[in-house]
Amino acid sequence: MGLDNLKVGLAQMLKGGVIMDVVTPDQAKIAEDAGAVAVMALEKIPSDIRASGGVSRMSDPGLIERVMDSVSIPVMAKVRIGHFAEAQILQSLKVDYIDESEVLSVADSSYHIDKRKFTVPFVCGATNLGEALRRISEGASMIRSKGEAGTGDIAQATKHIRAILSEISALTQAREDELPARARKLGAPIDLVRETARLGRLPVVLFTAGGIATPADSSLVMQLGSDGVFVGSGIFKSEDPKAYAAAIVQATAQYDDADLLARVSRNLGQAMPGVSNLDVRFSNRGV
């Protein structure tokens, strides 16, 4: 098995699960105990990044290492778009996955990281199929629909996952001789367009992120066709993080069981405060 296939296979192992943002080892343990398949180590969760403004960068390596030492599940960490030096640092730390993330400030407005040069699998965001295929062509092993991180508002997440999946559906119905024109319109390599049309899905796993705050939110995007979810501020900005973490994990695993969803949604306390009017849209970064 080639390195690229190995990295894609590692990401496939997370399918059907929940990846949670954490800022301390104690939060990482809560996530692991709740059944998260991985954690994202950050100095600030997205809602705090949004509130504080300024330039947001890769987290302190010491924090990332403390989180890695505290749990047995995979640990991810974020780098700025285009900042391959930050990615080199994370690879040296032996993180399990690197997220080239629009939640952080953009380091290079012209180029994303060439992820094929790394042994660590990368996660990248996308709002549409063209964006997703361009990131895969650069070596991304997992795509997450962007949504709007740190808002608690699911609207952009549903918009983006629907856009990606509807464009894939349209590809599967296209004639072979139409695919080169589709590839040009998408701004994506023809070989990836052909593979996606043949598979009827992306050649890598597709998670949803940005605005997931309740078990029902998680069920919604899973029913729409997501392979799993990232939950950032929705856990540790809620009234009862342990309860929300466990409930969202259960809702993701059994997303089509309405009786279970009703049961795990009871008596959770207040969900994270939401933000609907945005001056800064993270999802517009790094298209």
From Swiss-Prot:
One of the record's GO molecular function terms: pyridoxal 5'-phosphate synthase (glutamine hydrolysing) activity
This enzyme's EC code(s): 4.3.3.6
Pathway(s) where this gene product acts: Cofactor biosynthesis; pyridoxal 5'-phosphate biosynthesis
Ligand binding (D-ribose 5-phosphate): 21, 150, 211, 232-233
Binding-site residues, D-glyceraldehyde 3-phosphate: 162
InterPro entries: Aldolase_TIM, PdxS/SNZ, PdxS/SNZ_N, RibuloseP-bd_barrel
Keyword Lyase among UniProt keywords: yes
Enzyme class: lyase
GO terms classed as biological process: amino acid metabolic process; pyridoxal phosphate biosynthetic process; pyridoxine biosynthetic process
Keywords tagged on the record: Lyase, Pyridoxal phosphate, Schiff base
Oligomer and partners: In the presence of PdxT, forms a dodecamer of heterodimers.
Protein family (similarity comment): Belongs to the PdxS/SNZ family.
Name of the molecule in the record: Pyridoxal 5'-phosphate synthase subunit PdxS
